[in-house]
Amino acid sequence: MRNMTRWSALALVCVTVALGACDRSSPPGSTTATTPPASPPAAPSSGVRLYVSDETGGNVVVIDPEAASVVQRIAVGKRPRGIRLSRDGKELLVALSGSPIAGPGVDESKLPPADRAADGIGVVDIATHAVVRKFQSGQDPEVFDISPDGKTIYVSNEDAAEVSIVDVASGNVVQRISVGEEPEGVTVSPDGGTVYVTSEASSDVAVIDTKTQKVLARIKSGPRPRSVTFSKDGATAFVTSETAALVGVIDTAKHKIASTIQIPKTEGTATPPRPMGGALSPDGQQVFISLGRAGSVAVIDVASRKLVRTIEAVGARPWGIAVSADGSKLYTANGPSGDVSIVDLATGKVEKKIATGGSPWGVVVAVRK
């Protein structure tokens, strides 16, 4: 499906966060699209590519957004969720988990035992689309981020209420740090000095000092914080609060909530917004927040810290979200409907929906330069 031209460079535009009504779950009452089998590894051609983790299919789905088509499926392992490009753009990293999916109200004692051997961070070579390594990760890895120098990975371990620190050179966990209950979102500050970790059940954000590898502060957030997105200068961080329909604005110098942004329900709709994933525009002026069951995306102005518009009817429960390198397109992973939406940011309208099958969770944009 692709020729043997090698990508000379890639850029991570944005990534994030999650797909599921709660921690380890698919949304109640949702249907999961059938996942086609993975295709064999092939070298990618030039142009923009979307890499989408498919939690129920065990694949990373490769999409050509211009052609609006799936061009490959890379089999990576069980429950791929969090997904990022390496800092040098040569590899794709994806969190894999052997924990069974537990929907709301499910008695977890009746689920099959977790397959801890399946836990890890899978590494895919961008040039060949082959899985080349698997890092240790701690239990049930969900979301992770990479240090600016690319040498360290910070992983949320939901089952263990910990963050694992992974040395990229060895692929081993070198430290574990206790954080709040049900940690999910993990974001490294632009200067690499701190890591912000959201804890859903504790309703707080743990701030980890990367030098001491200790928690230096805990920021009380709104209920069920899901993700953190830093401003370009790192002075401000935006934390989503799922069940309060708000975004907290954190002063990172003080490690405190400075203000909150309430996301109103769309008039005439019964479904409240559920702030989930976040992505910063390339120029750093706006933050895009996926609103889950509301099927929309909130747009926040970084300078004024205000909601400036809401993009409606994006897709079924958008969560994972990313922005194109030129800032003209927005991409959302819509788990219940098994597709990815491409939004024209000039018009605020969905241009295309690309069927992925399975349950798309996170999305990464890679571009050839």
Q: What spans do the regions from the language model cover?
A:
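Bacterial N-terminal signal peptides that target proteins for export
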Residues: 1-11
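Predominantly soluble domains enriched in secretory-pathway, periplasmic, or organellar proteins
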Residues: 22-369
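Bacterial N-terminal signal peptides
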Residues: 9-20
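C-terminal or otherwise distal, non-catalytic regulatory regions appended to signaling enzyme catalytic cores
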Residues: 4, 19, 23-24
